[in-house]
Amino acid sequence: MSELLPMATYNLNIEPYSPTPAIDVTVPVTVRLTMAAIDPESLDDEKKPATLRLIRRNPAFDDEDDLLADSEEEEEEESEEESEPETKKPKKKAAKAESEEEDSEEEDSEGEDSDDEFEEFVLATLSPESQYQQTLDLVISPEEEVQFVVTGSYRVSLSGNYVQHPYDDEDSYDEDHEGCGENCACDDDHEGCGDDCACDDDSDYDLTPDEEDILDMEDASDVEAKIEELVEQEEANEKRKADEDEPKAAKKQKKDQKDTKKDAKKDAKKDQKDQKDAKKDAKKEKKVEFKKDLEEGPSKKKDDKPKTKILEGGVVIEDRVVGSGKAAKKGARVGMRYIGKLKNGKVFDKNTSGKPFVFKLGHGEVIKGWDIGVAGMAVGGERRIVIPAAYAYGKQALPGIPANSELTFDVKLVSLK
């Protein structure tokens, strides 16, 4: 098969529900379509997928009409030759009767053949959510009466090429040389042609299409009727689909309600369990209660006044409660509860509940004042330790602790290993 030769780019925009001829009657050139693409901008709020349809006049339908017309003309000519009317008046009556019969026959035939006059084909269904474009390979000749219609909410653009059909040259050659003899020499400046040569007779050839052809091609009533039929069909399909989806939606709603109830029960059980666990944890958690005088400072009673000792670097210790058991020495792991205060009495840190603060005594894991002040305590013992700035954080400022601050700690030894 010979290839089609592209001559120029072909583009056509099709608006929804607006029949558009495939080929401009003023440019009778063969067209090859290669691509259909959707414009993603919706022209309405429904956002229906765009379905591209091809509507073509049935060639067989036209052939039948031509044959019937030819046969009717021949019969009329024969009848006119056989019998000529004697007067003009009967002739007018006969002509009127014949025209009425022809009109009635045409109406009957149009009613019977309206469905067969046009053929409809779906080329593609496009949507911005699923498919933006579709490749095509469709060739349309000028002789075909083809229109495109788009149903949906989006504009569709067709692209391709105007092409030169391999048989176009042969057809034009045969038409140009009609009327020449067997020895026609039209290619040699018409030498050898007879007097009746029609090579130069351009007056009989007219590129402008007949008005009847244009009217047949753009028969708006037929095309609009077809479009209305398509729209009604789509609406019926959507209504049926909605009726089918409605019971599904009701079932889904019931299922969601059941799932919500189940989730609510699970959440309630989980909350109850969390509350029980919290109560158990509260019972298990060991809380160390400091004596009132440990937080408030030394007792005001003269008889219970704690003994004060000054240790290395000016670290001062006051034993409030003497513990029992062996004393803490360097290298022992001690668990402490404590309240840390500045010289003005402001609390900057404390550990009075939960997991005790554990460190290895005398190994520099805490400030130097703690290594000195905690040494010698027994489990259950309570002590106040006053630490000068040099044995605390010195010139370093920390959150809540200014630089060069003297620190006071009320501590209790809760474990010793």
From Swiss-Prot:
Compositional bias per record (Basic and acidic residues), positions renumbered to this chain: 236-249, 256-307
Record Pfam families: FKBP_C, NPL
Annotated GO MF terms: peptidyl-prolyl cis-trans isomerase activity
One CC-aspect GO term: nucleolus
Keywords: Isomerase, Nucleus, Rotamase
Keyword Transcription appears in the UniProt entry: no
Listed EC numbers: 5.2.1.8
Main enzyme class: isomerase
Reactions this protein catalyses: [protein]-peptidylproline (omega=180) = [protein]-peptidylproline (omega=0)
Entry keyword annotation includes tRNA processing: no
PPIase FKBP-type domain mapped to chain residues: 331-417
Region (Disordered): 42-129, 191-307
Domain of life: Eukaryota
Activity regulation, short description: Inhibited by both FK506 and rapamycin.
Composition-biased stretches (Acidic residues): 61-84, 99-120, 197-222
Protein localization: Nucleus, Nucleolus
Family that this chain belongs to: Belongs to the FKBP-type PPIase family. FKBP3/4 subfamily.
Function: PPIases accelerate the folding of proteins. It catalyzes the cis-trans isomerization of proline imidic peptide bonds in oligopeptides.
Protein name (record): FK506-binding protein 3
